Amino acid sequence: MGVNVFDEKAVPLFARVMAELGEIQSSSGAERVVVPLAPVERTICRVRVHFVTPTELKGVERPDFGALLSRIRDRVSTLRALYGPGPLAMDFRAFGERASQVYMTRSDLDYVESSRVSKNTGQRHPLSGFTGIAEYEGELAEFVPFLETAHWTGVGRQTVWGKGELSVEEI
């Protein structure tokens, strides 16, 4: 189910979901969401990621787990640096190495060709990418909070145009 967060009817739903996702705090009159990124405290060995809208990961044709988590980690760190308490305090290389130990066990992905036309310049801009389902297996407890966060932030290129929406479920 897709939701346009700019649609007034979606605002109550979006506010409720964000409240459930993290603790909402007031900061200088603006609302702020705190999303816990600590590993979940149970064993998770398999997840299914549904790439809802066309997703493009720069330099990657298939969303292997290491590349996917690197892009999510970088987006979360950048958002924290710009709007939160600062970039993630973690060993990025070690995180990436652990993520690369998770393997894709199923891939049912399609490449979708799409584009938009700029109203200002008339130029056509590609919005293509893969959609579908990928399943991953491995030690996932550390990574599930990042995948859940990516549901809200998107992942990959051109998320501002609606690309990179994903959902995740434990299987």
Annotate the PLM regions:
Residues 1-171:
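RNA-interacting cores
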